[in-house]
Design a protein with these regions (language model features):
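Extended alpha-helical targeting/anchoring segments
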Residues: 1-244
Length: 244
């Protein structure tokens, strides 16, 4: 096994209406994918930064995110964390591994020799964390249905690990609770055959006066446990702070 993405679940008391939490999240942590689902006995609230699989204009896109630092309290601190992230050999090697996995996933449902990395090792910043991000695009092979095209990238390597199946077996052994919504896919399918999905990250479930948030970190041979633990806390902060 090269990497396992282990997660932990945070639990808090539900102190306000779920829709009000979502409204606050839109202001405090705007993200590429914002969503609110109101079911009979629970709500899903999310602000995900990461594409799972997208099919648009006959292009398949995956956008792996791997490598995280907290945001700095000042511009100077922010720049320090950004530079520190981009020179961290462990984070860079992890990202490269997951970028290669993303290229392989997209390649399964793309025409031969059309896979391109259109963005590589860029920094994206959100309210509480910053990430290393790359973008992979391929020309969609139409012999694959939209559902098979989605499954080519599911589950994402950035929330499971590599190789995926063994990583998921270890996750099942070590995590105390089933992930349920966390790390799954949320999105839509259009009548024209296109679709867009994100990974259920920075996502909370509100039910029975409880508020659950789950966050993970990629564990490799040279991981430092305290840093990985702090990474999960930093990722959960945006949602937990929206309760206030």
């Amino acid at each position: 096994i090269f990497q396992v993405v282990l997660s932990q679940r945070f639990e808090a008391k539900l102190t306000k209406k779920p829709i009000d939490i979502y409204k606050k999240l839109r202001v405090t942590n705007p993200s590429p994918f914002m969503f609110f689902f109101n079911f009979n006995d629970f709500q899903i609230i999310g602000a995900s930064p990461e594409i799972l699989v997208r099919l648009r204009d006959n292009k398949i896109t995956v956008r792996p995110i791997a490598g995280t630092r907290p945001r700095g309290k000042t511009k100077k601190d922010d720049l320090y964390y950004e530079r520190d992230l981009l020179k961290d050999k462990k984070e860079l090697s992890e990202h490269l591994m997951l970028l290669d996995l993303g290229r392989n996933d997209a390649g399964k449902v793309s025409k031969i020799n059309t896979i391109k990395v259109t963005e590589s090792f860029i920094i994206e910043k959100y309210s509480h964390v910053m990430h290393i991000v790359s973008n992979v695009v391929g020309e969609h092979n139409k012999k694959f249905s939209k559902f098979k095209s989605l499954l080519a990238g599911f589950p994402a390597g950035t929330v499971s690990g590599a190789p995926k199946i063994r990583a998921m077996e270890i996750i099942d052994e070590l995590e105390k609770t089933k992930r349920k919504v966390y790390a799954g896919g949320i999105g839509y399918f259009s009548a024209n055959g296109e679709f867009d999905t994100c990974i259920a990250l920075r996502t909370a479930v509100a039910t029975k006066n409880k508020f659950y948030v789950q966050a993970g970190a990629g564990i490799v041979a040279d991981s430092k446990p305290i840093k990985e633990y702090e990474e999960t806390e930093n990722k959960a902060k945006a949602l937990l702070n929206a309760l206030r």
